[in-house]
A protein has these predicted regions:
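Helical element adjacent to the flavin cofactor pocket in flavoenzyme catalytic cores
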Residues: 208-253
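N-terminal glycine-rich phosphate/pyrophosphate-binding loop and immediately adjacent elements
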Residues: 3-134
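General beta-strand structural signal in soluble alpha/beta enzymes
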Residues: 31-32, 183-184, 246
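Flexible loop/turn segments at secondary-structure boundaries
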Residues: 37-40, 191-195, 252-253
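Generic recognition of stable, solvent-exposed alpha-helical segments in well-folded globular domains
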Residues: 10, 16, 107, 124, ...
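Rossmann-like flavin
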Residues: 95-200
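Flexible hinge/switch segments at interdomain interfaces of large molecular machines
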Residues: 199-208
């Protein structure tokens, strides 16, 4: 049965929800306070030598979206994307040259041992992280909220205590010996929000931030700016018949 649904907020979550609901046969109204859609995927511009340049004022890269969402919404046929496959470079003071953060766990393990004197096990870290990511992704399509009980059943208590319920500091101490390795891996937590590495459940931030599947857990770029993703999805939704109301306030509800 078709329903009339109002979604407040035209950020990426509101836009994706509107897309799926409209394609499922519902009447959808999307209300956004700002004059343009996008939420955190916003942009600003400046003029230099009579040329206007745009830059992201919020999010800048694409990484957490699931591939099936990227494809089913129609975004994959409308956008150009790029994810560099060359290793990231990590620089620390008093170290000659960069350390290469390889995607291949065995290459990464060898590099960390060579450059940072790492005697831990980066290969085991990535292998166990993949198990957690697989568990997280397993419920995305069904919209199923994961639970600790389900995690214990699928992953076992030891992995759950370490990777989900535990703190990031203890997690990194478990796999790594070098302070430089721990600092680098901890950046995933510190970049995502003001959470202490010693806080319970902070370990879960690491696999969560690597759980997108558009680029297989890595991050990439949208041609001409990440804001084109939300602008394009808004255009797709309007074409489907989503009633999109910008510069609007929600005054009351029934």
């Amino acid at each position: 049965m078709s329903k009339s649904i109002v979604i407040v907020g035209a950020g990426i979550n509101g836009l994706v929800a509107a897309n799926y609901l409209k394609r499922s046969g519902h009447e959808v109204t999307l209300i956004e306070k700002k004059p343009s859609p996008g939420g955190a995927c916003a942009n600003e511009s400046f003029i230099h030598n009579d040329i206007r340049y745009q830059y992201p004022s919020g999010a800048s890269v694409l990484g957490l979206m699931q591939r099936f969402v990227f494809e089913e919404t129609g975004l994959s046929t409308r956008l150009k994307t790029f994810s560099p496959e060359s290793p990231k470079l990590a620089f620390f003071p008093n170290h000659k040259g960069p350390t290469y953060i390889y995607r291949d766990p065995n290459e990464l393990d060898a590099e960390l041992k060579n450059k940072w004197g790492e005697s831990g096990d980066a290969t085991a870290f990535r292998a166990d992280e993949s198990k957690i990511i697989d568990f997280i992704q397993s419920g995305y399509r069904e919209g199923r909220t994961p639970s600790i009980d389900e995690a214990n059943s699928v992953l076992g208590n030891d992995l759950v205590d370490l990777w989900i319920k535990g703190d990031a500091r203890s997690l990194l101490d478990h796999y790594f010996e070098s302070d430089l390795s721990k600092i680098y891996m901890a950046m995933t937590v510190t970049e995502s929000g003001p959470v202490s590495l010693s806080e319970k459940y902070s370990a879960f931030t690491i696999p969560i931030m690597d759980s997108g599947s558009v680029f297989n857990g890595y991050y990439g770029f949208v041609f001409q700016g990440i804001w084109n993703l939300t602008q394009t999805l808004s255009e797709i939704n309007i074409g489907l018949g989503v009633d999109t109301r910008l510069s609007s306030n929600l005054v009351d509800k029934d």
